[in-house]
From Swiss-Prot:
Signal peptide: none annotated. Pfam families: Beta-prop_KIB1-4, F-box-like. It comes from Arabidopsis thaliana (Mouse-ear cress). Gene3D superfamilies: 1.20.1280.50. The keyword Repeat applies. Kelch repeats lie at residues 148-189, 190-234. SMART domains: FBOX (SM00256). SUPFAM superfamilies: F-box domain, Galactose oxidase, central domain. The keyword Zinc does not apply. This is F-box/kelch-repeat protein At1g57790.
Length: 352
């Protein structure tokens, strides 16, 4: 007598207890979770039960008055307006991380960390700068013991000065290293894997480790890109689960995506983001694994609103096109833009 082992195997997998299936699904990346969900009804139920929807960042921008600021939530296309504390009127946004902003006066000497949802302000020690700093960022919210604020500047050829500050310190810590790295046009700084990654105009990467206080320029050739300076205008670096990605584009050109492969010492070009959604801006970028239905996955959201600030400009890799194609991204305008994506707290709707 013959036995249909294939049919038996199918039934065995289909009839696994929901608790066991759900336990297995928790170990899957989101793209594999989605694939598993189409196998059968029981797998769909298990996959969906453990699937975590990432809350999208909000776009924060300043009207011309500068006395207020607006939030735009791309998940529901709603806008919220809040009043800027009088003490921060005239301050400029430099960087964003974990729902906080690093801001400074025009001369860059007076830095503060500001939470635009709770209105909390943390003043940093005065920083003596004879000229404008070139890169700046911070590792985490100032409520964390791991918070490190980082600035870098080259005062003379062949040397860079790195300054750091952490909560509880009354002054900045300074160090100088030999390096020809600094030739930057945008603030491309990402904190990931416990270190700061910095990208310069020539698309070389340097790494600063705040715990070891070491600075190293990686021996990685720049990503291959059309030999056109315009491609430097739309250049963004973002971190995702330990990976470093660079997005490059200009005007209405399709974005190019590169992933840093430290093992092989190369930038690997990617033609898809999978289920990832990236939100880019001049000051800092955000990434989300699985945004809610109604938003575009495998896409890049730009810091530009149109149609009376009702919709954001998005490029979809699935469709190979920009949404709102007729709206040109003015990269020259974006260079000086204060528009920035920021992570809202869980209770954001109670605060705005």
């Amino acid at each position: 007598m013959s036995v249909n082992t294939n049919e038996g195997s199918k039934n065995l997998w289909k009839d696994l207890p929901l608790e066991l299936l759900s336990s297995v699904m928790t170990f899957l990346e989101i793209k594999d979770n989605v694939r598993a969900s189409v196998v059968c009804k029981s797998w769909f139920e298990a996959a969906v039960s453990v699937r975590v929807i990432d809350k999208s960042p909000w776009l924060m921008y300043f009207p011309e008055t500068k006395n207020t600021y607006d939030f735009y939530d791309p998940s529901n296309c709603k806008k919220y307006t809040m009043e800027l504390p009088k003490s921060l009127v005239g301050f400029i946004v430099r960087y964003s991380k974990d729902g906080w902003l690093l801001m400074s006066q025009e001369d860059s000497s007076h830095f503060v960390l500001f939470n635009p949802f709770t209105m909390d302000v943390v003043a940093l020690p005065f920083l003596h700068l004879f000229t404008y700093y070139q890169l700046v960022g911070f590792s985490s919210a100032p409520t964390s013991s791991e918070c490190v604020v980082f600035t870098i500047k080259d005062y003379d050829p062949g040397h860079v000065t790195i300054r750091t500050w952490s909560p509880g310190q009354t002054m900045w810590t300074s160090m100088q290293v030999e390096s020809q790295f600094l030739d930057v046009d945008h603030n491309n700084v990402v904190f990931s894997n416990g270190v700061f990654y910095c990208l310069n105009q020539r698309n070389h990467v340097a790494v600063f480790d705040p715990s070891l206080r070491t600075w190293n320029v990686l021996d990685v050739p720049p990503p291959r890109c059309p030999d056109d300076k315009s491609w430097n205008e739309g250049k963004f670096m973002v971190g995702y689960k330990g990976d470093i990605l660079v997005i490059r584009t200009y005007e209405n050109k399709d974005p190019l995506v590169f992933k840093l492969d430290l093992t092989r010492g190369i930038w690997e070009e990617k033609d898809t983001l999978g289920s990832l959604t990236i939100f880019v801006s001049r000051k800092s970028c955000e990434s989300r694994t699985y945004v809610k239905d109604g938003m575009l996955r495998n896409s890049v959201y730009f810091p530009e609103l149109c149609y009376n600030e009702k919709q954001s400009v998005v490029y979809s890799f699935d469709e190979g096109r920009y949404h709102l194609r007729e709206h040109d991204l003015d990269w020259g305008k974006q260079l000086s833009s204060d528009n920035i994506w920021i992570e809202p707290p869980k209770n954001a709707f109670e605060l705005v």
